[in-house]
Amino acid sequence: MRKGLFYICLLLVGVGLFAGCKSKKAVVASFSDLDGEWGVVEMNGKTLNPEETHQVLVFDVARQGLSGNAGCNRLMGKIEYNDAYKNIIKFPQVATTRMACPDMSGERELLEALNKVVRFEAQGEAAPVSEIALFGTNNDKLLVIKKQNKITQL
């Protein structure tokens, strides 16, 4: 009887320990989460401040359109996305206006990164999705974008 009671207590303690352990699950981003304005906060491993770089991406999920600011010039293009292939995304033929600015290197780097993007995923562990990483074909993180609260005048 004592042995049986001991095993029952041991079982209850074990179940209690497992129930108390919460595993943190990463937030999963859907295509609709992309809708809206996003500041570029990381590019090719470098941390950026969108208020200084003026690099903003605006996703219009309903029209599958991309617009924004590459730093100096406005950008526009289409989004290739198919519900059958979750988190696979491409930005073919991104175009820009043609204003000349003193330093175009950040803009060129952003446009090259957008051209290489093949998938996206949420960053962090809390909903709603506030940061999304964009990856290239070799699973290299090209960009991290952060949801903006206000719409920037482009």
Walk through the language-model features, giving the residues of each.
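Bacterial Sec-dependent N-terminal signal peptides
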Residues: 1-30
